[in-house]
Curated annotation (Swiss-Prot):
Main localisation: membrane
Lineage top rank: taxon: Bacteria
Alphabetically ordered keywords of this record: ATP synthesis, Cell inner membrane, Cell membrane, CF(1), Hydrogen ion transport, Ion transport, Membrane, Transport
Purpose of the protein: Produces ATP from ADP in the presence of a proton gradient across the membrane. The gamma chain is believed to be important in regulating ATPase activity and the flow of protons through the CF(0) complex.
A cellular component annotation (GO) from this entry: plasma membrane
Gene field: atpG
Protein's UniProt name: ATP synthase gamma chain
Length: 288
């Protein structure tokens, strides 16, 4: 029964793996709910800043900000948001594939790129393909704080304000629902018209500025862009936990199927061994 013992060992090994993937699925489900709550909590903040900044900009068209103006630089910046850990299906692969397509188009046009990496997976990828990483933020944990993101992101924002890069793109995975996430590479700077469009349901107020309109608009636009980046990180984390939960559930289900197949093979092997022993006993008795 050497073969039977070997199969029993395989069954035990797969059962242990199934316990691990089941535990990871349950942990991911718990983290996913919390990540979704943080993602939803961040949206009203960025929406309110957008409304106020849009109203101020429309009421004071004589004021401009570098974030709303284009330039002729030959370098494009990317804020690449990925995960620190794996085991989340094709989440990182999909967004990095979109980024690669964008980089190839830029290379064909003779343009350069530099990036800020948020997450270990994106940082490793950018280093492998030779894209200049101006700054990075990793090991953000399950509760990302804006303070940890501002420093690295500010590197690209300052470069854009100084006219050193012509655009900044935000690469991340947008959360749609538990079973669906969408990889996106969207323009962050210069701010497009749709990003600066006030909510139609909001009242149009007359504001009193302190110290002045230009200072308020400048501060709000910086906070708004930072909020957009934070929102992308929050959505990416919700997507990560959803993808990990689905991946671990699939692994658990597959492990169950493998165990069933191995048990069937074990039973057939055991049955064949018993039949062989009985045949030998009968043959021996007949010889006597």
């Amino acid at each position: 029964m050497a073969a039977g013992k070997e199969i029993r060992g395989k069954i035990k090994s797969v059962e242990n793996t199934r316990k691990i993937t089941k535990a990871m699925e349950m942990v991911a489900a718990s983290k996913m709910r919390k990540a979704q709550e943080r993602m939803r909590a961040a949206r009203p903040y960025s929406d309110k800043i957008r409304n106020i900044a849009a109203h101020l900009s429309q009421a004071n068209p004589e004021y401009t900000h570098p974030f709303m103006e284009s330039n002729d630089a030959k370098t494009t910046g990317f804020i690449v948001v990925t995960t620190d850990k794996g085991l989340c299906g094709g989440l990182n692969t999909n967004v990095l594939r979109l980024l690669t397509t964008k980089l190839k188009d830029m290379q064909a046009a003779g343009e350069d790129a530099q990036a800020v990496a948020i997450g270990n997976k994106g940082l490793g990828f950018l280093n492998r393909i030779g894209v200049k990483v101006a700054a990075h933020a990793t090991q953000l944990g399950d509760k990302p704080h804006l303070d940890k993101l501002i420093g690295p992101v500010k590197v690209l924002l300052d470069a854009y304000s100084e006219g050193k890069i012509k655009a900044v793109y935000l690469c991340y995975t947008r959360f749609i629902n538990t079973m669906k996430q969408e990889s996106v590479v969207e323009q962050l700077l210069p701010l497009t018209a749709d990003r600066m469009q006030p909510d139609k349901t909001e009242h149009s107020w007359d504001y009193i500025y302190e110290p002045d309109a230009q200072t308020v608009i400048d501060e709000l636009l910086v906070r708004y862009v930072e909020a957009l980046v934070f929102q992308a990180v929050a959505e990416n984390m919700a997507s990560e936990q959803s993808a990990r939960m689905v991946a671990m559930k699939s692994a658990t289900d597959n492990a169950g199927s493998v165990i069933g197949e191995l048990k069937l093979i074990y039973n057939k092997t055991r049955q064949a061994a018993i039949t062989k022993e009985l045949s030998e006993i009968v043959a021996g008795a007949a010889a006597v």
